[in-house]
């Protein structure tokens, strides 16, 4: 039953849909693969869903990335990308299905090397924000390759001074950066991006986010503690049912649900033997025996 509960939980995860926007070479694939498990950005080029946007997804994976072309395009193409993003948002909302909706937009700006503040990018973003006023899809500005941190912080301050209607500006270094073997700048910012995503997404997508993200163990633990607290509250009430010898059998379904939720949040692929071992340590040998027979 526990394995069935886990499989059912995984099957029922809502699909998280993210639009990722930015110039070519901004590091979108590195960002995606560093934040999410299974290296979704390496599953292929994706399939075109409009003339400018491609959808990257994987079978039995509860997330899709909508990738836009770089901004080294003509002014007309840039305008077309913007219109197609808004059209994609409206089409998803029109279905009334959360699995089809766009839940977040990442606007990626490369601040590495000798990159400087580009007002053209900010102006494009302002136009997108204006068109997004009705749909209000959360927008996060991700400053990629933000090394050194002082450079990322400076760019963050410049973008924040624009007073854009966005969720947050986050400097990120998605992978460790090696400087000729003499110094290694450690990756940072991915855990903060997960936290901001968690704040921006609805409750229906919280389990999905934790399932697919691999950058923040702290966030997974926080979500799992909430699951345990909820299960404990239910078990406390069930434990007082005045039926002789019923407690263990009554509690087990609650604990199965709890274990399934935690396993899903951690994105683990585990066997029945591992599950039974975990159950034995949490609800005891007697509970494992009852569960094994059911």
What are the residue ranges of the model-derived segments?
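Conserved G1/Walker A P-loop phosphate-binding module
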Residues: 1-76, 266-269
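Conserved protein kinase catalytic core
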Residues: 39, 73-74, 113-116, 150-151, ...
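Cytosolic juxtamembrane amphipathic/interface segments immediately preceding
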Residues: 5-7, 214-223
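Conserved C-terminal guanine-recognition region of P-loop GTPase G domains, centered on the G4
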Residues: 81-167
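Short loop/turn segments at strand-loop or loop-helix junctions that form parts
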Residues: 66-71, 107-111, 144-145, 170-176
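Canonical P-loop GTPase G-domain recognition
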Residues: 1-3, 137-140, 145-207
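Small-residue-enriched, tightly packed secondary-structure blocks
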Residues: 220-294
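C-terminal helical "lid" subdomain and adjoining coupling/linker elements of P-loop NTPases
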Residues: 180-181, 199-219, 244-247
């Amino acid at each position: 039953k526990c394995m069935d509960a886990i499989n059912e939980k995984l099957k029922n995860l809502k699909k998280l849909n993210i639009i990722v926007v930015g110039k070519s070479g901004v590091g979108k694939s590195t960002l995606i693969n560093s934040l999410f498990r299974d290296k979704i950005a390496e599953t292929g080029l994706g399939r075109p869903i409009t003339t400018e946007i491609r959808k990257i997804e994987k079978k039995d994976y509860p997330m899709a990335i909508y990738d836009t072309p770089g901004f080294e395009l003509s002014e007309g193409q840039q305008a077309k990308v913007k219109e197609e993003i808004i059209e994609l948002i409206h089409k998803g909302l029109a279905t009334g299905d959360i699995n089809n909706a766009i839940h977040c937009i990442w606007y990626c700006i490369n601040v590495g090397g000798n990159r400087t503040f580009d007002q053209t990018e900010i102006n494009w973003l302002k136009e997108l924000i204006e068109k997004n006023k009705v749909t209000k899809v959360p927008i996060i500005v991700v400053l990629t390759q933000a090394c050194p941190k002082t450079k990322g912080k400076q760019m963050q301050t410049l973008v924040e001074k624009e007073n854009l209607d966005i969720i947050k500006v986050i400097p990120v270094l998605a992978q460790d950066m090696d400087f000729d073997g003499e110094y290694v700048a450690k990756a940072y910012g991915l855990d903060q991006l997960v936290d901001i995503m968690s704040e921006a997404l609805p409750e229906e997508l919280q389990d999905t986010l934790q399932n697919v993200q691999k950058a923040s163990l702290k966030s997974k633990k926080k979500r799992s503690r909430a699951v345990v607290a909820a299960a404990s509250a239910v078990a406390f009430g069930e434990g007082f049912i005045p039926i002789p010898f019923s407690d263990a059998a009554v509690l087990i379904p609650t604990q199965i649900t709890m274990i399934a939720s935690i396993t899903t949040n951690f994105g683990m692929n585990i066997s029945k033997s591992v599950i039974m071992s975990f159950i034995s340590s949490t609800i005891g040998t007697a509970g494992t025996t009852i569960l094994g027979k059911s």
